[in-house]
Regions:
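Conserved ABC transporter NBD signature motif
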Residues: 73-84, 125-140, 152
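P-loop NTP-binding/switch modules centered on Walker-like glycine-rich loops
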Residues: 66-69, 245, 249, 253-331
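A short, proline-enriched helix->beta-strand linker immediately N-terminal to the Walker B motif
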Residues: 234-238
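Conserved ABC ATPase signature
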Residues: 214-219, 223
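Conserved ABC ATPase "signature" region
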Residues: 191-210, 319
Length: 392
């Protein structure tokens, strides 16, 4: 597949939250919510981001839609570096451009032929065309920054976990779904009404006229989540972050919502980042998977390959927790020790070290492992599995 088919590329994404308040002096304690996360999603693909509560899944999704600022790293959507638009303050966006591009382009040993991506080459050409003037480069890229952020929101949307809290109780269903069209000034009043009616029909709220002027409290949980899906899709985004959209719904209607989302992905030609703690749901909704633990991705690849041949001890533990319908089947319990450690200033060693049944003395002395490809489209971050540390 061509690199032009990349919908999303995340490079070394990090998000730190201060874990203490100081009137004077520098904050020294940070929660490492997301720490060095990298992955790609190509056109037509959906990636399931799985892990326990607190591992950084939702924080990653909120960064992508601009609800959180990244601490460091780069977010590329459809070949465009959108990271500068994710920062609230222009000065922070300018600092990012300086560190990511200007300092690199001005390095004594910089070689333009070393630029691997089309986007990086375009950035360098722009820098050259502006006379290698750093201020002009930053001003050019940050011009109309708020407008570009609005354009980004048109391409990237989010479906939130709680359909009872994510819908304004004072707005009608029509107003909720039409609000993105109003913000982006799309269509006439009649065209908006037609578009809302169409999207409500697409998500299974039929006939649309019976839902348009009702309020959220008049709908069931499943109907509310269908409204949330309609709101996310009304602008025809290319990429949608779905944050456990079925976890708060009754079991009897979860499958219907998942089937609906898969159908809409085909009809609207879009990709999902599907956040979940349920591996069975992940398998149904995605064709790629990334397993997170304490802010790090520890295993990633084709979902069938990873689930049929898990290599990381944590992935094996997650699979062991999935219920098996056969009452006669007996599955061994995973040899996982203790509980999840606090993510405040974690040591540089492997995040899973304290609980890992494979951990050796070498694992304690070397930094957290990088993702290493162990087979076709199957990556794991484990010193022992990758052969960088001798097994016990």
């Amino acid at each position: 597949m061509s690199r032009n088919d990349l919908i999303l590329k995340i490079e070394n994404l990090q998000k730190l939250f201060p874990a203490e308040r100081r009137v004077f002096g520098k904050v020294r304690l940070f929660v490492h919510a997301v720490d060095g996360v990298s992955y790609e999603i190509e056109k037509g693909e959906s990636l399931a981001l799985v892990g326990e509560s607190g591992c950084g899944k939702t924080t990653t999704g909120k960064i992508l839609v601009g609800l959180y600022e990244p601490t460091s790293g780069r977010v590329i959507i459809e070949g465009e570096d959108v990271t500068p638009y994710l920062f609230q303050h222009k000065s922070r966006a300018g600092q990012y451009l300086k560190e990511m591009y200007i300092d690199r382009f001005n390095a004594p040993d910089f070689d333009p032929s070393s630029l691997e991506t089309e986007m990086d080459r375009k950035m360098y050409e722009l820098y050259q065309s502006l006379g290698k003037n750093s201020s002009s480069f930053v001003d050019h890229l940050l011009r109309d920054r708020s407008k570009k952020m609005i354009e980004l929101r048109r391409r990237v949307q989010m479906i939130f976990q709680d359909p009872y809290e994510s819908l304004n109780p004072r707005m009608t269903i029509y107003d909720i779904v039409a609000e993105p069209l109003n913000i982006h000034n799309i269509g006439s009043i009649k065209e908006r009404e037609e578009r809302v009616a169409q999207i409500l029909a697409d998500v299974g709220l039929t006939p649309p006229d019976t839902f348009m002027f009702r309020f959220p409290h008049e709908l069931s949980g499943g109907q509310r989540q269908r409204v949330a899906i309609a709101r996310a899709l009304i602008l025809n985004p290319t990429f949608v972050v779905a944050d456990e959209p079925t976890s708060m719904l009754d079991v009897s209607i979860r499958t219907g919502i998942m089937k609906l989302m898969m159908k809409l992905a085909d009809e609207y030609d879009m990709s999902y980042l599907y956040i979940t703690h349920d591996l069975a749901v992940a398998r149904y909704m995605a064709n790629k998977i990334a397993v997170m633990y304490l802010g790090k991705i520890i295993e990633m690849g084709d979902i069938e390959e990873v689930l049929h041949n898990p290599l990381h001890p944590y992935t094996k533990a997650l699979l062991a927790a999935v219920p098996v319908p056969d009452p006669e089947y007996r599955r061994g319990e995973p040899d996982i020790k203790g509980s999840v450690a606090k993510p405040i200033n974690p040591p540089p060693r492997c995040r899973f070290y304290d609980r890992c049944p494979l951990a050796t003395e070498e694992c304690a002395k070397i930094p957290h492992p990088q993702l290493k490809e162990v087979s076709s489209d199957h990556f794991v971050a484990c010193h022992v599995v990758a052969g960088d540390a001798k097994p016990k």
